[in-house]
């Protein structure tokens, strides 16, 4: 089977990783109009619950994320000059660019074809 993914953002990359793991013989190609090191947007934050989903679905992605993201489990809530610290709510975060680099790395490790600076104007080129 051949799968073409249009868009090399986090969703397209992670879909490609999980699909390639589930169907290793599948030929998956991602087409992204920007360069591999381009990034738009700011930071990305995941909760502990989301991290547990990464761990259950792709431990390699989880390990990369935990090794490169900042992690915290305390939050300060301030109101009217009073600050309250809340613990037990784990989060991790990084720049969007870092997340894209990690997911691109995982795609390559799984054998996903990545095509950058590939503006797709006509989907018929992918018809079989």
Question: Which residues does each predicted region cover?
Answer:
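Short, glycine/charged-enriched secondary-structure capping and boundary segments
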Residues: 19, 43-46, 128
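Conserved N-terminal glycine-rich FAD pyrophosphate-binding loop of Rossmann-like flavoproteins
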Residues: 34-55
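Beta1/beta-strand and adjacent pyrophosphate-binding region of the FAD-binding site
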Residues: 1-11
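Short alpha-helical segment within the catalytic ATP-binding CA
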Residues: 14
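Glycine-rich FAD pyrophosphate-binding loop
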Residues: 6, 18-41
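Short, solvent-exposed loop/turn segments at secondary-structure junctions
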Residues: 10-11, 35-36, 121
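Conserved N-terminal helical subregion
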Residues: 48-128
């Amino acid at each position: 089977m051949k799968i073409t993914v249009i868009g090399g953002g986090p969703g397209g990359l992670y879909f490609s990783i999980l699909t390639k793991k589930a169907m290793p013989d599948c030929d998956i190609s991602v087409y992204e109009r920007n360069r591999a090191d381009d990034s738009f947007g700011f930071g990305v934050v995941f909760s502990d619950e989301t991290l547990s989903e990464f761990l259950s679905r792709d431990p390699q992605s989880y390990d990369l994320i935990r090794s490169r993201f900042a992690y915290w489990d305390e939050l300060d809530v301030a109101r009217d000059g009073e600050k309250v610290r809340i613990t037990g709510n784990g989060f991790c975060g990084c720049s969007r660019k870092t997340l894209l680099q990690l997911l691109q790395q995982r795609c390559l490790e799984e054998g996903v074809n990545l095509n950058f600076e590939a503006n797709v104007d006509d989907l018929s080129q992918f018809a079989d």
